[in-house]
Amino acid sequence: MQSARELGLFFTKNGANAVIGHHEHLVQIAELTPNGLCAYCLGNTLGYHGIDQRDEHRLANYSIILHLYLQRRSGGGISSRYSFSIAKCVANDDGHAVCHLLNDLIKSASEDAEREQLLRDQAFIYKRFTGQDIDNINRSAVEFPFPQT
C-alpha cells in the first residue's frame, strides 16, 4: 500500500482532485490530503466474492460509493467536496448478487439482532474507510461527509 499511497499523493500534489485506486476488492482507508482525496480501494460492488460468508476481519460484501462534487471557481480552479455511502452486496432469491445501500438494509431489518449486526458493520466499515470512529455521526444518513482532518 505504501507505493499506492505515494502515487496518490503525487497525483493530488500535481493537480488531481481525487485518486481512486482498486486492488484488494475490500474497503481500504482513504485520506484527505491538502490537495485532494486518495481512496485506495472502494470495495467490490460488481462481484459475488464473499457475500455468502461472514468474515469479521474482511467484510468483503461491503463497498463504498464515493460522491465527488466538483465546482468551477469564478477566479479559476476547481473546488472539491467529498462524501460517501456504504453499500452491501447480498444474494437474492435466485442467488445473484444485489447491492443495496446499507442504510436501506438497516431500516428494513425485521429483527433487532440483524439490525444491530448491520450497525456494527456500519461502524467497522466507516472506521476502515475514514480512520475515524462513527460516534458523532448521524448513523441514519444515507451519505456521510468525508471527515476533515
Each PLM stretch: what is its role?
Residues 2-64:
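Conserved beta-sheet core of the metallophosphoesterase superfamily
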Residues 1-11, 135-144:
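Short N-terminal signal/transit or membrane-insertion segments
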Residues 55-149:
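A short C-terminal boundary segment appended to hydrolase-like catalytic domains
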